[in-house]
Amino acid sequence: MKNHNLSIILLAGLLASCVGVQPNPPYVYNTNPTYSWGYAEFYGAYYANYGNRNNVISLSLFSDSLKINDIGSLVGIGQYLFLEDVFIAPTDTLLPDGTYTISDSGLPFTVSPGKNDTVDNEVYPIGAYISYYEVNSARSTLKLITGGTLTAIRFGNTYNIACDFKMDDKLELKGNFSANLPHIDQSLATPKSAARKRFANIFLPKNFGN
């Protein structure tokens, strides 16, 4: 009888300890960042060799804790939004006002979606994506942008940009920017279809591309 009672007590204690153990909640990334600085790079008719004569701008936006150091690397904590191919009309050289849609069409007022590209057995992101530089570097990651829109309105030297994207993990990505947006002319320095410079230390999650 004593052994039976002892078994009941041990079982009750085990069940109580199990009830108290809760799984760790999923890590939450900032899906509505405020970008405080950025720039646009103009590449002209970058895809003219492929029959698309629309001009292309690459747009980079950063949260205020990210910066570029003396050797040209991105350092700090925060979010980095990169839109590699923003298509504009052949007559435009600055980012015009309007709503831009994530699309593969290559038409004006579209942005190429984020995808995986494989070169020499290495997987790289192309198109539209956001990089998260977290305090815990093990949480730092990159997410592709696969749908949604971006709206840009210019007031003098200030651009107001609002994002309403969908990421490859099905989550929404908002975000806003309101500041001066310098435009850098790369059309002469970068031949059509040539590789464009990126930050060398952009990381990829271990399972990226799988």
Regions inferred by a protein language model and the residue ranges of each:
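Bacterial N-terminal signal peptides that target proteins for export
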Residues: 1-8
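C-terminal motif of bacterial Sec signal peptides marking the signal peptidase cleavage site
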Residues: 16-17
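Edge beta-strand at a domain terminus
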Residues: 23-26, 146-147, 162-210
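Surface-exposed helix/loop patches within compact recognition domains
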Residues: 25, 49-153, 209
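Residues at beta-strand starts and edge strands
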Residues: 55, 79, 157-159, 171, ...
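A mature extracytoplasmic/lumenal domain signature
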Residues: 87, 156, 165-167
